[in-house]
Amino acid sequence: MDLQLKEKLVLITGSTSGIGKAAAKSFLQEGAAVIVNGRKQETVDRTIEELSGYGTVHGAAADLSKTDEAAAFIEKVNEIGDIDILVNNLGFFEVKDFADVTDEEWNQYFEVNVMSAVRTSRHFLPKMLAKNSGRILNIASEAGVKPLPTMIPYSMTKTALISLSRGMAEMTKGTNVTVNSVLPGPTWTEGVASYMEGAAQAAGQDTDTFIKDYFKVNEPTSLIQRYATAEEVANTIVFLASDAASAINGTAQRVEGGIIRSL
């Protein structure tokens, strides 16, 4: 299927690793040009170098949890070109007891996981509506509808992203602009690999055995009983950004291997 993404310009926040980087590669393979983003210029430059063989890659480093850096970032993006597709992927998580999470940490979760998407969307959604064309995808999580007791702040922010997406989608009524959220489940990324290695060590098990048993013990409702790959999630992101998904708007698209036991 030709997704008709050639010559589209895609901005993906938090795209120097994990799902964001996989999505950047997938968009490039479909013929789109991509702007990658990370906090550090060196990681942005490295990502550009790694992906440049697949197509046209631009980069803009910024910490989007900070208002001033986000504003400068948006100016730089506008200098690169007119965005057709915005993927708000920036986010982080930490496993921590609820009672131990400080006010400062709660604020950090909100600034990184929610306000980064608000800042970019607040600028680019009106521009998309003005030209009657565009896609916004907010990368949430299955934790947004099935909150995780060991990651309550993270879960809260992902619920907020789902609500943000639906609210913005209501603003697109009758236009050719769509806004959707994507809800990955357990996905194998660099960050997850690091966490699992640490958890296996703490449990006194080798990593391979620990990972093999993880779904049986911790995620028994998963229907695929494995981690999704970042590429599998990226495939859904790219499809929703295409004209082939023009009738899909305001949804929270699950890519969680059936882990949520509801219709």
Swiss-Prot record:
It comes from the Bacteria. Keywords: Oxidoreductase. One of its GO terms (molecular function) is oxidoreductase activity. The keyword Oxidoreductase applies. One of its GO terms (biological process) is monocarboxylic acid metabolic process. Gene3D superfamilies: NAD(P)-binding Rossmann-like Domain (3.40.50.720). Substrate binds at S141. The active site is at Y154. Transmembrane segments: none annotated. NADP(+) binds at T13, G14, S15, T16, S17, G18, I19, G20. Its EC number is 1.-.-.-. It holds the Pfam family adh_short. It is an enzyme of class 1 (oxidoreductase). CDD domains: SDR_c. Belongs to the short-chain dehydrogenases/reductases (SDR) family. This is Uncharacterized oxidoreductase YvrD. It comes from Bacillus subtilis (strain 168).
